[in-house]
Amino acid sequence: GRILDFQDFTSSTPSVSLHDDSGHGTHVAGILAGSGQVSSGLYAGIAPDTDLLICKVLDHEGNGNIQTVLKGIDWILKIKDSYPLHLVNISVGGRPTLPPGQKKLLLDAVEHLWDLGLTVVVSSGNYGPRPGTVAVPGTSPKVITVGVPDTLPLFRTGHSSSNYSGRGPTDHCIKKPDVFAPGTGIISCNSRYISSMQSASVRPSLFQRPTFLSSQPYIAKTGTSMATPVVTGAIACLFSKYPDLSNVEAKLRLHNSCQPIPGTESGWGLL
């Protein structure tokens, strides 16, 4: 997919220069809409023709806070009428132990997006496996919350189990996550990749710092952040065929498309 707009909210002066110093956002974007060009299509995203608007809300260590996420949501509200925006993928989440006031701020923000007609897909977080560990704002009854199942009987990922996904019930006794998708050992784009052609113009000293540069275009990562764009990409494909669907109708279609799997204590099943 193409990146139509970008905004970085992690510094005191918001930047519009496209960059990713943590790798999280690039990996998520690749799962959703990567072209797979470097791998001859092998590692293409779920919906490779999808256009992207990207908010950077995590710093170079992959950490974030409520304020940067809220700034990102405010930006979406400001630009949503300038683009054909249907979906919002939120592959971040606050701890279930957030103070009530901060929880409310996040929940109100994502539910406002939903009430405006946008389909909001969020991760359930990696705070499991105990009950009541869904990350905020995944506890919202309106948004689509994505988790990773404890077992993946249909796939061979090299991981026999994944026992990290946040799970319900929520504080209001709502079952969550809504849907499950693969999120363990997912291969997608590496933000530190530099091609052989690019390397010719890079200072040799940088190659002594493998933390910053890599010759590998793809990398495997694990988490509900990786499962969330799988679901978002599937809904993007749905909208490409049925562009007039509402977010409620899309949620119902998703519900009816899930396959129940063993080991899942709640939710609709595996997409």
What are these regions (language model features)?
Residues 24-28, 65, 72, 92, ...:
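Extended, hydrophobic alpha-helical segments in both membrane/secreted and soluble proteins
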Residues 11-17, 159-166, 215-220, 264:
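Short beta-alpha connecting loops at secondary-structure transitions
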Residues 29-32, 53-59, 88, 133-136, ...:
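Hydrolase catalytic cores
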Residues 73-83:
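Short, well-structured alpha-helical segments in soluble
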Residues 7, 83-190, 253-258:
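Catalytic-core segments of hydrolase enzymes
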Residues 270-271:
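Short helix- or helix-capping micro-motifs
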Residues 39, 71-74, 164-165:
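Alpha-helical scaffolding within the catalytic cores
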Residues 1-7, 16-67, 81-87, 115, ...:
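Subtilisin-like serine protease catalytic core
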